[in-house]
């Protein structure tokens, strides 16, 4: 429920920097400067020319992935009002399906293909349906400047309600009103909750947040009559309850207090909240607030406390479901609404990661569980909150693949006296003393990069690669404290952990191995920072939309989502924090050395990490490195922070092929 907008905009700063001095001309906010576009196209031509050398590897990967196509277990459909719904892709295009509950004949509710096929980038944000009205948000250029579209399913007529909004959308039960979050024109900060009359297009601002380091958002309540609207920064929350039909907004559930977070939901005319009011997150309950009367803190009654806090909760007709963690094991517990525990069971099974998917609405009493490991195909299970039983729904089957041929394990590496977990996998009969390592990392915002099962990763294992994920500080592997140890002035800890993981994996199992790195977005900070620390530790790297110009990005609060990110990256207006940021900033720390080969991918319309960050970074590497690379820049002129799903697989094949070509060359030289 917490906001996850990150990396909107790059900012010019007066900080002295060779990189900035030499390559600031690559920044073009209009994305129309012919000199810049010509440079990016020339770099693409250079990259495409080099990629021809290993085109056979790229095509082989695509063929392997195609031949390994799974007999997919059906993903559970969303349950709403006794109907099942599924937004899926067919031949690459989005289509919305529905059926009666329990696997009746499906029907096409809406086919997005005509909207999608005429564009080189197309992404759906969220969709809602009430009766014959379908409301969705769409991004048509990768800029994440969504627009809301209302469709009359009887006639098929579609019309745009509003543009330059966030991706979220809600539709009132009577379908007469839409709810969106409008963005500031210049900064793209989500700052207004806007209610739109779907018949007249009349707009009304329900709540505007003027504090520049706060963001606005909303989510539906378990009780379909309501939504929770909120404003929050990195550590503080303010929420109100909205009646979707009437548009009536309650007073704040609790006035904002620095460091106090709470996330509420509504059921049975009561409000339940997960809050760190008393330190650890715990569940509280209170009565529905009146319109103009603030909820007194004294009216919050404790509902559930746990030694390590409550991670999340969900409300169903049959009870409240809570997730807690003990010894890094997550537990699902079901409680009656009078607070009595009805059932408790582990979320994960041995060796697998698992997470909940709330695809069932309040009355369905169904919650879905997705689980897998790096070498075990995905499994869908369903937990019935009413009868308290768990059943298998489906599992992906990969013919010719046997989990017994592979090893998936977790090791601990020491970094500055701290034990850092690393998930890794390899194929048993391919493990040799010089088997190379591909190391992936992210390490920010408290996100945990789960060790997913992916055919693409398995194809690397089949070619003798050890694939690893470093769960560095700054991520969420060990909870909130693990995040705190790698954010702000402690951000360098994330990079130190990644370097320590690479050093340990270089000699994993007594071997002498080449290490290759992959990182996306904040993971680019991690990889680029680690390469600055030890360029000779890495044999190659792939960075996708990398956040590498940190001090510059965080030095101008007038541009997108800068002040909101001080807690994560540091505040350059404070001398001590600026010093810490300068110490890890990837561009500021490029120096004369033999940097490894790199492939950097950027999206021209990216509003989170603008294209010029990666372009400036690689230009500086190319001009400074004492090695010959190659240093390849690839710009997607039709996407932003994410690539269009229709091109994503081919792009991933090119990235893996780049690394495999380096591995092949290295082995030939040994």
For the regions a language model picked out, list residue spans one by one.
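Short loop/turn segments that connect beta-strands within beta-propeller blades
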Residues: 101-103, 152-156, 197-201, 243-247, ...
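Asp-box/WD-like beta-propeller blade repeats and closely related beta-sheet repeat scaffolds
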Residues: 110-126, 135-138, 142-184, 191-194, ...
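Structural WD40 beta-propeller signal
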Residues: 128-130, 172-174, 221, 267, ...
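Solenoidal tandem-repeat scaffolds enriched in leucines and small polar residues
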Residues: 167, 171-241
């Amino acid at each position: 429920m917490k906001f996850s907008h990150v990396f909107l905009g790059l900012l010019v700063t007066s900080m002295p920097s060779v990189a900035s001095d030499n390559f600031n001309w690559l920044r073009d906010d209009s994305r129309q400067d012919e000199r810049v576009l010509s440079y990016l196209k020339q770099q693409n031509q250079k990259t495409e020319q080099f990629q021809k050398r290993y085109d056979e590897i790229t095509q082989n990967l695509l063929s392997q992935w195609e031949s390994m196509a799974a007999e997919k277990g059906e993903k559970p459909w969303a349950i709403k009002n006794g109907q099942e719904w599924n937004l899926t892709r067919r031949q690459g295009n989005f289509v919305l399906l529905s059926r009666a509950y329990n696997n009746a004949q499906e029907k096409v509710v809406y086919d997005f293909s005509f909207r999608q096929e005429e564009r080189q980038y197309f992404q759906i944000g969220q969709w809602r349906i009430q009766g014959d009205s379908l409301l969705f948000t769409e991004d048509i250029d990768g800029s994440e400047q969504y627009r809301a579209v209302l469709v009359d399913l009887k006639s098929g007529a579609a019309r745009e309600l509003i543009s330059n909004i966030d991706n979220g959308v809600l539709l009132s039960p009577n379908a007469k009103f839409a709810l969106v979050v409008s963005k500031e024109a210049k900064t793209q900060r989500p700052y207004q909750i806007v209610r739109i009359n779907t018949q007249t297009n009349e707009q009304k601002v329900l709540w505007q947040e003027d504090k520049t380091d706060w963001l606005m958002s909303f989510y539906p309540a378990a009780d379909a009559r309501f939504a929770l609207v909120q404003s929050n920064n990195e550590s503080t929350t303010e929420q109100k309850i909205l009646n979707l039909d009437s548009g009536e907004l309650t007073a704040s559930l609790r006035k904002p207090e620095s460091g106090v977070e709470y996330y509420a939901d509504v059921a049975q005319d009561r409000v339940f909240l997960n809050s760190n009011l008393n330190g650890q997150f715990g569940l509280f309950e209170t009565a529905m607030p009146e319109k103009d009367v603030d909820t007194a803190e004294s009216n919050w009654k404790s509902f559930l406390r746990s030694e390590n806090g409550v991670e999340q909760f969900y409300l169903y007709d049959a009870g409240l479901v809570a997730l807690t963690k003990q010894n890094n094991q997550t537990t699902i517990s079901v409680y009656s609404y009078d607070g009595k525990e009805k059932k408790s069971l582990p979320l994960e099974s041995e060796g697998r990661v698992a997470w909940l998917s709330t695809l069932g609405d309040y009355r369905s009493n169904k919650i879905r569980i997705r689980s897998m490991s790096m070498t075990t195909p995905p499994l869908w299970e369903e937990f019935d909150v009413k009868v308290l039983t768990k059943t298998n729904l489906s599992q992906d089957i990969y013919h010719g693949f046997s989990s017994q041929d592979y090893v998936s394990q977790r090791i601990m590496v020491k970094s500055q006296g701290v034990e850092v977990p690393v998930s890794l996998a390899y194929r048993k009969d391919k493990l040799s003393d010089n088997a190379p390592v591909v190391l992936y990392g992210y390490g920010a915002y408290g996100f945990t990069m789960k060790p997913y099962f992916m055919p693409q990763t398995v194809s690397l294992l089949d070619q003798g690669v050890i694939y690893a994920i470093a769960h560095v500080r700054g991520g969420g592997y060990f909870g909130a404290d693990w995040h705190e140890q790698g954010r702000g002035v402690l951000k360098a800890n994330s990079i130190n952990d990644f370097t320590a993981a690479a050093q340990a994996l270089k000699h994993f199992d007594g071997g002498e191995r080449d290490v290759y790195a992959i990182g996306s977005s904040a993971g680019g900070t991690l990889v680029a920072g680690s390469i600055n620390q030890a360029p000779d530790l890495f044999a190659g790297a792939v960075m996708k939309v990398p956040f590498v110009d940190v001090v510059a990005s965080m030095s101008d609060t007038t541009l997108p989502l800068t002040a909101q990110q001080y807690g994560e990256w540091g505040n350059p207006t404070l001398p001590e924090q600026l010093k810490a940021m300068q110490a890890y900033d990837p561009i500021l720390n490029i120096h004369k050395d033999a940097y490894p080969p790199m492939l950097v991918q950027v999206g021209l319309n990216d509003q989170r990490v603008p294209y010029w960050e990666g372009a400036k970074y690689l230009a500086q590497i190319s001009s400074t490195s004492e090695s010959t690379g190659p240093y390849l820049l690839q710009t997607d002129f039709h996407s932003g922070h994410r690539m269009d799903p229709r091109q994503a697989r081919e792009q991933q094949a090119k990235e893996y092929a780049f690394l495999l070509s380096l591995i092949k060359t290295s082995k030939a030289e040994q």
